[in-house]
Amino acid sequence: MMAEVDAQVGRLLTALDELGATDETVVVVTSDHGEMLGDHGLMSKLGFHDQAFYIPLIVRAPGGTGIETACTGGAGQVVEGFTENIDVMPTVLDLAGAEVPRQCQGRSLRPFLDGSVADGGLPDGWRTAAHWEFDFRAWAGSRELDGLDGHLCNLAVHRDHRGKYVHFAGMAPIFFDLEGDPDECEPLGDHPLMAGYAAALLDWRMATDEQELSDHLALPGGMIV
């Protein structure tokens, strides 16, 4: 799989060179999910472990025609802050000089690309945790999940550098102390930080839950944006 991805990305980059478009093109290499590859006895993108959700994100923004200039100051930097795939679209729009819709939940990665934040630093207000959800109804018939109703077969995660909190709709939550257990081998059912992580996860869910009219409020007097 990795050899195939490497070959196809190489074909794309070669074509850009042949077209003379390399210095005018933003290249983003990322993925929609990771791969367990047998870790924790799992395959595919199952579960809540980092292997399934820790994905690559490589951005090259050369600053040529059609791309706002001065976007190479952060070249070669490895960002330790949390990014999410919802950041890709606002980043591309920002680099192209287009307006980013205000309802976008992601943020432009431009500060990391142009070097406006110091190596290892974060822009003001940048997220300090990552979140994800997983629906495992397709595996609800397994022995471990026998009797768990389909609408309860889902989980949500709040993960920062200190720990990971996993909330299940139909089972007890668990916590991983990533300082003492970085490989996530010891799920804890009780930890002093769990209540705070649960509250932070609820805050995120309430702020980002599906909205019929995103970022709009309909009142008798009209629409508030």
Regions of interest found by a model, annotated:
Residues M1, L188-V225:
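Long, internal low-complexity/basic segments
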Residues M1-E4, G47-F53, G66-P90, A96-S108, ...:
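A short beta-strand-to-alpha-helix junction
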Residues M1-T25, W204-R205:
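A long, amphipathic alpha-helix that forms part
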Residues M2-V5, V9, V26-S31, L57-V59, ...:
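Beta-strand elements within well-structured catalytic alpha/beta cores of enzymes
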Residues T14-E84:
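Histidine-centered active-site microenvironments of extracellular/periplasmic hydrolases
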Residues L16, G20, A96-V100, S116-V117, ...:
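A generic secondary-structure signal for well-formed alpha-helical elements
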Residues H33-D39, M89, D94-I174, L178, ...:
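C-terminal cap/loop subdomain of S1 sulfatases and analogous C-terminal strand-loop tails that border
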Residues D181:
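Intrinsically disordered, low-complexity polar regions and short flexible loop motifs
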